[in-house]
């Protein structure tokens, strides 16, 4: 294995570094720098161990030039270990999400923008948070004073590829726990040879003698997910392991105990309501939170969410304060102490140990928040919220029939995912249609005038439009759709959706204006214009061209070439001194 990993030329690079004190901030990397390809997938790899004197301690960070603040190190240490209530023995995989200290980073190269412009909004890189994907091992070991070997291998990334990174950890971690540092360095070197994440393309990712084949969804894909097509297999030895999805969880397994409350939970997610998820272990907690936040796809989940959260987190006080309304966050925890601390929260979901028996597990009950007890709270959804829409009984019957017929879990998950997707689309399509009607007509966009403005969004006008163009056209669910839209208008998700759509429409308007300029006769326009007006046009065209070349404006390559030709034509008509200013040697 080591010989296989060590073949081929390798750039000089840093050694595995102990996690000593560092200043905050990130070491900027250019695309040609060492670890640039690695950084397209991962920020760093961490190893967290248990020290008898220090407790959880960061043993190493790799690459060793990646800088974490002391607060980030502390968060990674606590979030990478199950708390004492979980009692996880053996190997456990889970994930967490933590805030980056110091706010959003500046992208160190254009690949971030390039990737985000092509990826579905739900799979875009996180600008201000890290995902941590954890493989934790706790086994008896008589050679250790405490009597147990306790260590976590953590992949830190800005990409929400939970399935991919869990699969990667299941390959790397067992080998690492046996061979330690040399194995990890070789793996990181392999990842540094991977192609960049490219939405819409099938990628072959070699690691530890295995080729993992994945396809990252593209923004232009049809809604229904499909596994990557296998091709070029004859040139790949060994044959690749095809990962059906980089991000989709087994929804049916996650939601088995709460299927009767899916409608209520979907509405709580849509409205961005604060929700505490109390689970018996970090793997159950993190999967439930990630499953809940995926319910709104293809909408971006605009609220905060923490798949696994502990009382040691630096944001503990922020989330548990009673001096203001609970924040819009989905919080996954395993410590029952949170029941007491957060009993003022409006919605609390308590789930038990997962049971994968043949029958559908006992469904958690809907209970009033006043029924909350402290540490011995029974499984249930504790909320006073009443769903606006009736639940889909036909879906429940289909899923129950699937359980009786021993239908595979992935097929059950596909049924559930399709239901949630169609529900979200039925809700959002009327909003999309109304928003599109606010766009100025193309014939009103003329080359030499400022483009007309997008009309303002009127909630009353939209609600009136639902009578003839509402969700009832595509969804059979009955209920108070109007009431749901009214509450949605007050939620972070409406604000996030509206800002994103308005931004896209403004860019489209700008692109149409650029096309109108490029299709006009510029020489006729210049005849009666002053030099100041001509120079102003050059500067504005250049600005639009830069934005378009940076993939910010949706324009065709032919339009870009025509715009460049226009700029050259206009500059050529100016006196030599102005030409020298606009085109310095």
Swiss-Prot record:
Occurrences of domain cDENN (ranges): 246-373
UniProt domain uDENN: residue ranges: 43-214
GO cellular component: cytosol; recycling endosome
dDENN domain sequence ranges: 375-499
UniProt keywords, alphabetically: Cytoplasm, Endosome, Guanine-nucleotide releasing factor
An example molecular function term from Gene Ontology annotations: guanyl-nucleotide exchange factor activity
Source organism superkingdom: Eukaryota
Cytoplasm listed as a keyword: yes
Compartment(s) where it occurs, according to its Swiss-Prot or TrEMBL record: Recycling endosome; Cytoplasm
Pfam families cross-referenced by the UniProt entry: DENN
Primary location class: other
Protein family membership: Belongs to the DENND6 family.
Biological role: Guanine nucleotide exchange factor (GEF) for RAB14. Also has some, lesser GEF activity towards RAB35.
UniProt protein name: Protein DENND6B
Native species: Homo sapiens (Human)
């Amino acid at each position: 294995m080591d010989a296989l990993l060590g073949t081929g030329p390798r750039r000089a690079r840093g050694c595995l570094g102990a996690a000593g004190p560092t200043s905050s901030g990130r070491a900027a990397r250019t695309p040609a720098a060492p670890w640039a390809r690695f950084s397209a997938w991962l920020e760093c790899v961490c190893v967290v161990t248990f020290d008898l004197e220090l407790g959880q301690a960061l043993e190493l960070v790799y690459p060793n030039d990646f800088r974490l603040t002391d607060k980030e190190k502390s968060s990674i240490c606590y979030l990478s270990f199950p708390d004492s209530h979980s009692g996880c023995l053996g190997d456990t995989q889970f994930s967490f999400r933590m805030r980056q200290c110091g706010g959003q980073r500046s992208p160190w190269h254009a690949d971030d923008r390039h990737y985000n412009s092509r990826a579905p909004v739900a799979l875009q890189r996180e600008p201000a948070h890290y995902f941590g994907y954890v493989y934790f091992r706790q086994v008896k070991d008589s050679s250790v004073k405490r009597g147990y070997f306790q260590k976590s291998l953590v992949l830190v990334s800005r990409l929400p590829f939970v399935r991919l990174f869990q699969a990667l950890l299941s390959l790397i971690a067992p080998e690492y726990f046996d061979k330690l540092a040399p194995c990890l360095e070789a793996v990181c070197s392999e990842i540094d040879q991977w192609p960049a994440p490219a939405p819409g393309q099938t990628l072959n990712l070699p690691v530890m003698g295995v080729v993992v084949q994945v396809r990252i969804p593209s923004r232009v894909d049809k809604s229904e997910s499909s596994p990557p097509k296998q091709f070029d297999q004859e040139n790949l030895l060994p044959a690749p392991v095809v990962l059906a999805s980089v991000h989709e969880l087994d929804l049916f397994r996650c939601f088995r105990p709460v299927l009767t409350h899916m409608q209520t939970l979907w509405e709580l997610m849509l409205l961005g309501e604060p929700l505490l998820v109390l689970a018996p272990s970090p793997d159950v907690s993190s999967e439930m939170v990630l499953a809940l936040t995926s319910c709104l796809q293809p909408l971006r989940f605009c609220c905060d969410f923490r798949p696994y959260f502990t009382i040691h987190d630096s944001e503990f006080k922020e989330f548990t304060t009673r001096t203001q309304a609970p924040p819009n966050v989905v919080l996954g925890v395993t410590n029952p102490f949170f029941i007491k601390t957060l009993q003022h929260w409006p919605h609390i979901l308590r789930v038990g140990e997962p049971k994968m028996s043949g029958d559908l597990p006992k469904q958690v009950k809907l209970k009033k928040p006043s029924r909350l007890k402290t540490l011995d709270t029974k499984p249930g959804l504790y909320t006073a919220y009443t769903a606006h829409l009736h639940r889909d009984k036909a879906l429940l019957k289909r899923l129950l029939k699937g359980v009786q017929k021993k239908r595979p879990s992935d097929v059950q998950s596909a049924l559930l995912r399709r239901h949630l997707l169609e529900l979200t689309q039925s809700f959002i399509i009327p909003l999309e249609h109304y928003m599109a009607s606010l766009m100025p007509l193309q014939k009103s966009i003329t080359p030499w005038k400022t483009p007309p403005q997008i009309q303002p969004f009127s909630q009353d006008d939209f609600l009136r439009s639902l009578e003839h163009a509402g969700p009832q056209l595509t969804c059979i669910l009955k209920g108070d759709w109007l009431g749901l839209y009214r509450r949605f208008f007050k939620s972070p998700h409406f604000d996030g959706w509206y800002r994103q759509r308005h931004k896209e429409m403004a860019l489209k308007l700008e692109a149409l204006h650029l096309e109108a300029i490029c299709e006009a006769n510029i020489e006729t326009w210049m005849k009666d214009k002053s030099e100041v007006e001509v120079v102003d046009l050059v500067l504005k065209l250049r600005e639009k061209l830069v934005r378009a070349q940076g993939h910010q404006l949706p324009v065709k390559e032919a339009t870009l070439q025509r715009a460049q030709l226009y700029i050259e034509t206009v500059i050529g008509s100016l006196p030599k001194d102005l030409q020298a200013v606009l085109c310095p040697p």
